[in-house]
């Protein structure tokens, strides 16, 4: 009896505990697997019940909110379009795609228009004509777009502020230089010289390149050939040797009956029509033919200018600021016209023969037979 009684109560609680634990574990595992509700009698059960109660409350709240905004519709009167399948933008702001661009709609009994930047309806006076955005938004947008940032302004000022003055100074200097060059040159406007006369700017004169081309520079103005810059001629004529008085030389050339020296009477008698002035050089004789005697000279210009020649030994420059270069021994220069064109001498052999005869008459005089060698 005692053993039974001992074993009974000893066994009873053990079996009860084992049975309770087995049922609890099976029910717990089954609840986790199949989603069944599990209720516990101890503290764990209370927490489970409270958690289940919280879940049910959340579901109720969610269901209520879902029911109130479950089907979004367009808020324009007379539309009520279902926006469930529309884009998120239209469903959020409760407007359909058509009425979002309509110029005038009625919302809550007021004529309004949907602003695409504000994403809400505004009254019509807040819009400008056909603009889809309100005036306030457009003003801010244009201000941000047109007004540069202060940082960009400072960068531009620091980057281009030093370059612009230098460019301006260079450009100004270039303009002044070209203007002064044009003033000094003074090219002819209507008539030009022969094509063989090369005209160059003062900045690179030809006599700096080749001194023999000093007489090929000139310009035509008022029927005469003259250098435009007296300072340039003064610097070049400092090294010249020859006649110092231009008026004296001009008077010698302009007087057809005044002899050049004591031994050239035959020369003047043979040339009654043209005034001829002969000069000898190492290359041969050079002849200048004047169709008319030149008139009284002005300050810097002559109508029919005499010509200037440069020789190895003697330099003859009747007029300081007038000049023309000729090729020796085979070229004749005629200034009968105002143009002063170049003419090739067709009778240079005759001129040389005549020159030799004149030299013979000079060399042997009737009174004294002294030899006069020309330089």
UniProtKB/Swiss-Prot annotation:
Localization per record: Nucleus; Cytoplasm
Span(s) of short sequence motif Bipartite nuclear localization signal: 131-147
The record's free-text note on cofactor binding: Binds 2 Zn(2+) ions per subunit.
Gene (name only): SPL9
The protein's name: Squamosa promoter-binding-like protein 9
GO biological process, one term: leaf development
Function: Trans-acting factor that binds specifically to the consensus nucleotide sequence 5'-TNCGTACAA-3'.
InterPro entries the record matches: SBP-like (IPR044817), SBP_dom (IPR004333), SBP_sf (IPR036893)
Keyword Lipid metabolism: no
Region (Disordered): 1-30, 43-73, 252-278, 345-375
Ligand binding (Zn(2+) 2): 115, 118, 122, 134
Organism: Arabidopsis thaliana (Mouse-ear cress)
Induction record: Negatively regulated by microRNAs miR156 and miR157.
């Amino acid at each position: 009896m005692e053993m039974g009684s001992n074993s009974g109560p000893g066994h009873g609680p053990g079996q009860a505990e084992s049975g309770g634990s087995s049922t609890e574990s099976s029910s717990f595992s089954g609840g986790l697997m199949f989603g069944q509700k599990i209720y516990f009698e101890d503290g764990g059960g209370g927490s489970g019940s409270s958690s289940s109660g919280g879940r049910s409350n959340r579901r109720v709240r969610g269901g209520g909110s879902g029911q109130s905004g479950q089907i979004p519709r367009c808020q324009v009167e007379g539309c009520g379009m279902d926006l469930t399948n529309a884009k998120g933008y239209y469903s959020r702001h409760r407007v359909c795609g058509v009425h979002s661009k309509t110029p005038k709609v009625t919302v809550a009994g007021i004529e309004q228009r949907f602003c695409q930047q504000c994403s809400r309806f505004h009254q019509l006076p807040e819009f400008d004509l056909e603009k889809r955005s309100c005036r306030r938004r457009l003003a801010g947008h244009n201000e941000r777009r047109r007004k540069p940032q202060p940082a960009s302004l400072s960068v531009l000022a620091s980057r281009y502020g030093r370059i612009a003055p230098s460019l301006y100074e260079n450009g100004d200097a270039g303009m002044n230089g070209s203007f002064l060059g044009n003033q000094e040159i003074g090219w002819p406007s209507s008539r030009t010289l022969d094509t063989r006369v090369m005209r160059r700017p003062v900045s690179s004169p030809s006599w700096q390149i080749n001194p023999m081309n000093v007489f090929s520079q000139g310009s035509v103005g008022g029927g005469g050939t003259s250098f435009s810059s007296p300072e340039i001629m003064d610097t070049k004529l400092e090294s010249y040797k020859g006649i110092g008085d231009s008026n004296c030389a001009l008077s010698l050339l302009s007087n057809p009956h005044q002899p050049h020296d004591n031994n050239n009477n035959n020369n003047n008698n043979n040339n009654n029509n043209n005034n001829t002035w002969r000069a000898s050089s190492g290359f041969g004789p050079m002849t200048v033919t004047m169709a008319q005697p030149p008139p009284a000279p002005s300050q810097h210009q002559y109508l029919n200018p005499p010509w200037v020649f440069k020789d190895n030994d003697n330099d003859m420059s009747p007029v300081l600021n007038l000049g023309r270069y000729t090729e020796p021994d085979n070229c004749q220069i005629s200034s009968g016209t105002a143009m002063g064109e170049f003419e090739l001498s067709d009778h240079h052999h005759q001129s040389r023969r005549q020159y030799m005869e004149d030299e013979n008459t000079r060399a042997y005089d009737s009174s004294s037979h002294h030899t006069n060698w020309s330089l």
